[in-house]
Amino acid sequence: MAVPKKKMSKSRRNSRKSNWKKKVLKKVLFALSLGKSFEANTNVNFSFGDKLPQ
């Protein structure tokens, strides 16, 4: 079974988790935008904001 050899520092862990959350949030916003466009029958054109909510 694979296990890490050394303990990962809190700052490194938090940094990686933050990057992962940003990527997930971007995908979620894209999926919601696409879903809204399909619901409104404007599935040819859709967009989502570049700004991430804080």
Swiss-Prot record:
Location within or outside the cell: Plastid, Chloroplast
Domain of life from the UniProt record: Eukaryota
SUPFAM superfamilies: Zn-binding ribosomal proteins (SSF57829)
This protein's UniProt keywords: Chloroplast, Plastid, Ribonucleoprotein, Ribosomal protein
Molecular function per GO: structural constituent of ribosome
GO biological process, one term: translation
GO CC annotation: chloroplast; large ribosomal subunit
Renumbered residue ranges of the record's region Disordered: 1-20
Pfam annotation, one family: Ribosomal_L32p
Major localization listed first in the record, in broad terms: plastid
UniProt family annotation: Belongs to the bacterial ribosomal protein bL32 family.
Classification via NCBIfam families: rpmF_bact (TIGR01031)
The name this protein goes by in its record: Large ribosomal subunit protein bL32c
Taxonomic lineage: Eukaryota, Discoba, Euglenozoa, Euglenida, Spirocuta
